[in-house]
Amino acid sequence: MPEAGFQATNAFTECKFTCTSGKCLYLGSLVCNQQNDCGDNSDEENCLLVTEHPPPGIFNSELEFAQILIIVVVVTVMVVVVVCLLNHYKVSTRSFINRPNQSQRQEDGLQPEGSLWPSDSSVQRPGASEIMCAPRGRDRFTTPSFIQRDPFSRFQPTYPYVQHEIDLPPTISLSDGEEPPPYQGPCTLQLRDPEQQMELNRESVRAPPNRTVFDSDLIDISMYNGGPCPPSSHSGISAATCSSNGRMEGPPPTYSEVMGHYPGTSFFHHQHSNTHRGSRPQFQPNNSEGTIVPIKGKDRKPGDLV
């Protein structure tokens, strides 16, 4: 044991390098370490380039700087990614919440500027041709079909739908006196005054006459019976609307009754010449039977009753 302790002491006391100034360096690591350990720089003069090593403190500082730079870059990238994701989800949520309100505003905006439902304030000017559109109560509050299919869809322009509705030609129906009343749709083309239109509609639903008396026969009846009767404006009128006193006292005669009194002759025989007026069939009221019986003009005398 004393020998081992002596050898260790001798190793520490042995001079590894002797400086020019006579100073002794006991550690070999102090030689050529780029530090002036001798004081006269004699320990760094004869060092080879291969054996020269930078001090370990330089490597440690560079390593720490690289680690710090890498950590800063990674943290910055992570923060940027998190901010982008939060912004994206915030915009998506806001747009999803605002879509129902936007659809409601667009539906409300169709009333004044979409022309899908006209307003109720349609002014009627007599004598002028105009189109009156009166929306029904059910259609005024009905959402269009293209909005009902996808309420959360983006708003599409209504120009194609409006143009399709405007380009449709108007339908003008002329009354012939026997047709049903016109269809009262949402849009009606009015070419007459309201009073004339109501009169035509009232006449169009009138019951058909029992039999037809043409205008020429009606004029002849009024001339010979002394009762004024205006000419008909239609193709025919009821026989009970005109008589000698302007009122019929009984139902009109049937075809068999008329042909039974005058077999071989036609009940409706038209002659428009004044030379054959005497041979034209005439009508006289029969108070006993309540019917009109025609007689020949040449056999008629004033005051004769059948």
UniProtKB/Swiss-Prot annotation:
Disulfide bonds join 19-38, 32-47. The chain crosses the membrane at residues 65-85. The keyword DNA damage does not apply. GO terms for molecular function: R-SMAD binding. A motif (PPxY motif 1) lies at residues 180-183. It is a single-pass membrane protein. A motif (SMAD interaction motif (SIM)) lies at residues 208-211. Keywords: Disulfide bond, Endosome, Membrane, Signal transduction inhibitor, Transmembrane, Transmembrane helix. Residues 269-279 have a biased composition (Basic residues). Residues 296-306 have a biased composition (Basic and acidic residues). Detected in all tissues tested. GO terms for biological process: negative regulation of cell migration; negative regulation of epithelial to mesenchymal transition; negative regulation of SMAD protein signal transduction; negative regulation of transforming growth factor beta receptor signaling pathway. Residues 86-306 are cytoplasmic. PROSITE patterns: LDLRA_1 (PS01209), LDLRA_2 (PS50068). Pfam families: Ldl_recept_a (PF00057). InterPro entries: LDL_receptor-like_sf, LDLR_class-A_CS, LDrepeatLR_classA_rpt, TMEPAI/LRAD4. Its main location: membrane. Residues 100-127, 268-306 are annotated as: Disordered. SMART domains: LDLa. The SMAD interaction motif is required for interaction with SMAD2 and SMAD3 and the negative regulation of TGF-beta signaling. Functions as a negative regulator of TGF-beta signaling and thereby probably plays a role in cell proliferation, differentiation, apoptosis, motility, extracellular matrix production and immunosuppression. In the canonical TGF-beta pathway, ZFYVE9/SARA recruits the intracellular signal transducer and transcriptional modulators SMAD2 and SMAD3 to the TGF-beta receptor. Phosphorylated by the receptor, SMAD2 and SMAD3 then form a heteromeric complex with SMAD4 that translocates to the nucleus to regulate transcription. PANTHER family: LOW DENSITY LIPOPROTEIN RECEPTOR CLASS A DOMAIN-CONTAINING 4A (PTHR16514), LOW-DENSITY LIPOPROTEIN RECEPTOR CLASS A DOMAIN-CONTAINING PROTEIN 4 (PTHR16514:SF4). Belongs to the PMEPA1 family. This is Low-density lipoprotein receptor class A domain-containing protein 4. It comes from Mus musculus. The lineage of its organism: Eukaryota, Metazoa, Chordata, Craniata, Vertebrata.
